[in-house]
Amino acid sequence: GLDVEAPTGNMVVDIGGGTTEIAVISLGGIVTNQSIRVAGDVFTSDIQQYMRQQHNIRVGEPTSEEIKIRIGAALPDLDEQPEPFIVRGPNLMTAHPVEIAVTSNEIAHCLDKSLAKIEAAVLQVLEQTPPELYQDIVERGIFLTGGGALIRGLDKRLYEKINIPFHVAEDPLRAVARGTSMALRSTSKYPFLLR
C-alpha cells in the first residue's frame, strides 16, 4: 500500500459506484481533493442509453453492468480485445426479440464523455497541488482504485491525456476498504480519523 505518513505526495483516484474521489495525500492528511458524481453507476447508465440510441434495444441495469464488466473499455483498439458481448432484448420499435454483438470499441466510445469529466477533475486537483508534492506525483505516478479502475485501458488513456503514469492498485475493488481497516487498527497513529 501507500505510505500515507511520508512527507511525499501521493495521488489517489478512487472510482467507486456513485462518486470518483480524487485526493493528494501527504504526512497522514489530505492536501487537496475533489469528489465528482461520475463513476461506475454513470458508466452503467451511459451503456443503457447507448444501447437504446445506437442499437434500438432496451436493456436493464444488470445487463448494462455485465456489459461494463465483460467488455468495458476506456480506449478503442485495445491490444487485447475481449470477445464481443451478445445482448438480447426487445427492439424498441417492434418489441420483437433481437440479438446484438457489442464490442469494447463501442463501449469506449460510449464512456468517452464521462471519462473526460474524470480527467478534468484530476487535472483540477493537480492544479491545486503544491509544486513539491506535484513533482512527487509526476515521479511516482497516480494510483487508481475502485471498481472503475478495472475498465480496460483506463490507466493508458489517463496517461495519454495527463502525461503522468497511472497505476491500477492491487485488488482495486477492496484497496480503499483494506487501507481504512489498517488505519482503524492503528487509530493512535491516525487520530484525525476519529474526528
What spans do the regions from the language model cover?
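Conserved phosphate-binding/catalytic loops in two-lobed NTP-binding clefts
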Residues: 156-181, 190-195
